[in-house]
């Protein structure tokens, strides 16, 4: 029966092929069903969120990316997730031999045994010169190309729910010209849809530019990109969806990593402002003069910038607020972009601040963050886990300068920071941000990066010179 069905696909005229194939699939008991809301989970952290639940069954998708962007790893991850869901998966390799695929998968701790891997690489199919001579044959013989026929036979015989062809760039070589390749692709996608199969193809960007018919043939186009950062310090990977027929999706570029666990994606979600009712509580520093200056303290749920030049006590003041919040049984967390936890503990002991008991009780946490190791959206995801799941009431960031200097590799730090603050405000979290200014004396300047609009309160620490001596002063220049 497989040969009969494939005969319709390969041998008869194009005008009749489409109708006869559909009729034949109906005779086989495969009915064309309307799209439902059911989704096929990708098994890739973050991608289901970007695609609003996963891929739509019976649709065809293409992963577009240059070599090394993660197309093969992502495809295998998707097939392995299907195995977990009791779905049969087939991987048709046009490039790598199965033994190399399995070897690379083993480095990720994956067992590809449940996936059927079909080898269509050059070594398996035969000498490419054989196919390069197609132009000398009559068209009727050309359409009997064994690779196209074999794909059809495999799908009909194995009846997979998930299929990957890696890649259609190489599949192009098995058609005599672009026109015939486009016809083959359109019919293949129709055939897979009627067979109840969800397909993922991969190709390179140049191929998509040269053959735009692929864009209209598939239901979804997903781009994987890799570039060097602006200062050429790190690689930046992201994924974005150009087309996703039948569904909404999260727009924009979403950072991704290839880790020892496979592909991980960190969705770029623009947080929305939400009105939060505050209890009217205040967080006090327990420094009488400062609390009087602040009208009793800092209101819960607000954002405060502590700004000033180096050495004025900004970090110590922020830690003082966090300690007092923790002593009042509120959970507090400090994200440090510059100092390690050990350095902060040493400094706090030197000024008589007993931080360790609060750390041991779990009321206070100090978390050192190397911004070069995290994408901004990855950092925000870590904050969501800390604030949302671990229920922190107060958060501090030390410092905005360290955050800005490294996170600017990924784009506008002000936009990313605003996203973080918007999320924290929606959670009712009290936020302290430490900002270092460059000027020691002279003109008054709140911040160097122009972020004062994010703050409800601004505490300014400065140096003054009096009678040949340097002193420190503090003032509250903004309080809502």
At which residue positions do the language-model features occur?
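P-loop NTPase motor core
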Residues: 61, 139-217, 221, 375-454, ...
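Conserved P-loop NTPase
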Residues: 31-38, 126, 140, 158, ...
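Pre-Walker A adenine-sensing motif
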Residues: 44-54, 287-297
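Conserved nucleotide-binding/hydrolysis micro-motifs of P-loop NTPases
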Residues: 95-99, 107, 121-125, 169-171, ...
């Amino acid at each position: 029966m497989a040969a009969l069905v494939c005969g319709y696909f390969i041998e008869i005229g194009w005008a009749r092929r489409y109708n006869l194939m559909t009729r034949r699939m109906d005779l086989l008991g495969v009915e064309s069903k309307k799209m439902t809301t059911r989704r096929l989970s990708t098994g890739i952290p973050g991608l289901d969120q970007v695609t609003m639940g996963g891929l739509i069954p019976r649709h065809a998708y293409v992963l577009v990316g240059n070599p090394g962007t993660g197309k093969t790893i992502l495809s295998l991850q998707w097939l392995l997730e299907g195995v977990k869901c009791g779905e049969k998966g087939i991987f048709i390799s046009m490039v790598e031999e199965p033994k190399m695929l399995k070897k690379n998968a083993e480095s990720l701790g994956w067992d590809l045994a449940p996936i059927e891997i079909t080898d269509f690489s050059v070594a398996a199919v035969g000498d490419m010169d054989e196919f390069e001579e197609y132009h000398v044959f009559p068209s009727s013989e050309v359409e009997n190309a064994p690779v196209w026929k074999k794909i059809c036979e495999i799908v009909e015989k194995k009846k997979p729910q998930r299929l990957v062809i890696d890649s259609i760039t190489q599949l192009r070589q098995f058609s005599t010209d672009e026109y015939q390749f486009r016809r083959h692709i359109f019919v293949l996608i129709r055939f897979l849809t009627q067979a109840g199969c969800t397909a993922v193809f991969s190709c390179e960007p140049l191929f998509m530019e040269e053959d735009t018919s692929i864009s209209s043939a598939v239901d979804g186009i997903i781009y994987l990109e890799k570039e060097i950062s602006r200062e050429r310090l790190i690689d930046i990977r992201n994924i974005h969806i150009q087309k996703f027929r039948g569904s909404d999706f999260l727009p924009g570029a979403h950072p991704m990593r290839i880790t020892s666990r496979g592909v991980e994606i960190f969705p770029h979600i623009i947080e929305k402002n939400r009105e939060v009712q505050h209890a009217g509580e205040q967080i006090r520093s327990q420094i009488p003069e400062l609390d009087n200056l602040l009208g009793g303290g800092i209101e819960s749920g607000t954002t405060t910038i502590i700004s000033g030049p180096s050495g004025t006590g900004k970090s110590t003041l922020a830690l003082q607020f966090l300690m007092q919040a923790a002593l009042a049984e509120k959970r507090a967390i400090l994200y440090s972009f510059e100092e390690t936890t050990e350095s902060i503990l040493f400094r706090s002991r030197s000024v008589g601040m007993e931080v360790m008991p609060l750390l041991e009780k779990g009321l206070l946490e100090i978390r050192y963050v190397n911004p070069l190791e995290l994408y901004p959206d990855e950092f925000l995801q870590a904050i969501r886990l800390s604030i949302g799941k671990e229920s922190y009431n107060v958060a501090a960031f030390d410092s905005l300068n360290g955050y800005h200097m490294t996170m600017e590799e990924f784009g506008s730090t002000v936009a990313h920071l605003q996203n973080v603050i918007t999320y924290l405000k929606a959670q009712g979290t009290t936020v302290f941000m430490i900002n270092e200014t460059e000027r020691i004396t002279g003109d008054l300047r709140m911040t160097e990066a122009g972020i004062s609009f994010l703050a409800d309160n601004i505490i300014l620490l400065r140096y003054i010179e009096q009678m040949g001596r340097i002193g420190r002063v503090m003032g509250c220049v903004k309080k809502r």
